[in-house]
Amino acid sequence: MGTRPLLRCRRTLAVAVLAAVTAAAPGALPARGSSASAAAPAFDTSPAREALERLLPSRADQFTLVPVEEPPAGASFSVSGEAGAVEVRGTSPATLLAGVGWYLERVAGVDIGWPGESVQRLPATLPGVPATLTRSATVRHRYALNDTDEGYSGAYRDFDSYRHDIDVMALHGVNEVFVPTGAEYPYHQALQEFGYDAAELRRWIPAPAHQAWWLLQNLSGFPDPVSEQLVEARAALGSRIARHLRALGMTPVLPGFFGTVPPGFAARNPGAVTVPQGKWVGFDRPDWLDPTGPVFGRLAEAYYRAQRQRFGATSMFKMDLLHEGGTPGPVDVASAAGAVQRALEAAHPGAVWVMLGWQTNPGAALLSGVDRSRVLIVDGLSDRYDGLDRETQWGGTPYAFGAIPNFGGHTSLGANTGVWTSRFHAWLAKPDSALAGIAYLPEGTGGNPAAFDLFAELAWQPGPVDRQEWFAAYAARRYGGADPHAAAAWEQLRLGPYSGLSGTWSEPQDSLFTARPSLTASRAARWSPTAMRYDPDTVERALAELLRVAPALRTTDAYRFDVVDVARQALTNRARVLLPRIKSAYEAGKLETFRSLVREWSADEELLSRLVGSDRRFLLGPWLAGARAWGGDPAERDRLEYDARSILTTWGGRVPSETGGLRDYANREWDGLVRDLYAPRWNSYFARLDRALVTGTAPEAVDWFAVDDAWARGHGTYPTEPTGDPVSLAGEVHAALVAATSARVVEGRAGRVRRG
């Protein structure tokens, strides 16, 4: 105790001295204690300090942050120091945080994940660093967030939520983040100079949860007009997000302008030529303004001017021409792409155009029309298919190794981590490699923390990662201490959900509990895997091991999240065993067997609802409360709630939902959804099958869209705080699974005896 004030004084003195000197000359991280010229520091470390105080409020004062000029080789950090006095040297505020993150994991043995943390296990005095830790990024671009992230992760969050996510991304070495929040603002402002009034434009702009697909030129105007106050509030939030990123030395990646315009644009603007874009899964796509025509440059200038005035300048802009079925019509694609890039260059000289590598985009014609040195393709398919040669396909255009381990914000556990660790460094080492970054692109974030942790680390490891060693180390820090049962649990998860193979899918299967009721259901979302992608026993074994973790570690936030998540996945996987048995009983006309199995299914869904209700990150209530909080009056609150409910269920109107296949695309096992939508759907369906067995008639048909749409338009409230004990409820799941397995064994033996 007696040494603490002295340590604190030393740290205060160190910070004061460092603020008056320059960081080391470019080329290397200076050795600790080396002299520096009496000039201004390389950058202001206070944003990193403030982030530390948010993330580690009672330990932040034990870190000294030293700014260092970034050498041509790129970002780097080093960590050294004695107990209670840890020095981190880095080339940006965000890189300083990455150094802190490396220290927390490698020295202090705790985790700040996305989500879940174990910092409560830190000792009062932080441990010293036995040997200096040094890391340099192997790639310049460390990009995060899918175009759809805001829609599927929550379009109605507040600044504190976004700031926390950015702080955590920085802690894991990310330096470029897509910021779509408030993207409607420059359209709303610029298009008023081209014949539209504000009210018209607010009818064209979609509500926040659906806005990502408007930016991708897939739809417009759904579900209701947005208000002036909402446009303004979102612009204010987006501006704060961009400022926070800049303060940390990170790059906000803003949506660029590539020609999306409202109906009737050509009629109001002589000389303009627009190309109808047809339909996107049932939605009318917005028109595309020909970038080679005389009006495009003027509109692009107005757009970028309004954007810069509100959001500030940046150096990276996201644009995807002809996304998912867009058509160029008579427009020459190469010329159009060149015009789009020239407009960007005029507004932001030297800016990088970020494109998504998805399906066949970007095509050779598009790339032939641009300066490829100022393009970055964030590849959404790096881990999905085999036989990829991006250098040949994209003609040497710089690209980022990317992954989409989650679609629609599904709560499924797992990822193709073995593909990541085998491919990334192999692609980087190719003689003609154009690999320039990583891109973490799940459609929804806030789950699968091990996947994010491992993927982000690829950019900071000098060579291939040994997955077995990595997961063992992850288990040792995740709950703030080494534990043999935690290690065994994560080894099972590595062997199971986190060993997905390439070839077809990049995400795990979704849940049958969330699927539209059918005896032949194999997935909930139309584009999800139709079968298990791993041995489900690995998850049950992992759950059994997690429940044996030492009591002291069970109090951590990370453990409580993980035990719910793993128990949820284990219970969910059982549905794929149970549903075929229900189908067999129904088709065989075995009423009592059918009823018994249906009772098991219903009991599992009831238990699932209670389980996920024990962790706030699996609650529907905050999602809906957040949406309503953005409304300026009761009517707007109701409209925004529908926006938030519909994206999770019907997604759109009847045609996009049913014919287009978007229904349940964003399914997730959240309390509220399970209890009030998914379970009642299955109960209603099974009741109809039961009546059909009793009466010998065909089951009554159901208009499931009407059922889902009624729920989406409802206004029932849901808990915003968890209830129940996560560990006890996970234990209930384990007991139920053990009992079910035992019952199947007994049933199998009885069947063999009868046959004998």
Regions found by a protein language model. Give the residues of each.
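Secretory targeting and sorting signals
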Residues: 2-36
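N-terminal low-complexity, Pro/Thr-rich disordered segments
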Residues: 26-39, 746-756
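C-terminal substrate/ligand-recognition segments
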Residues: 529-554, 564-587
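Contiguous, structured surface segment used for ligand recognition
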Residues: 39-139
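Second-shell loop/turn segments in exported
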Residues: 84-90, 150-156, 228-229, 290
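N-terminal structural segment of carbohydrate-active enzymes
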Residues: 139-182
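Catalytic-core regions of glycoside hydrolase
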Residues: 60, 111, 115-126, 147-149, ...
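C-terminal amphipathic alpha-helical interaction region
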Residues: 578, 583, 591-748
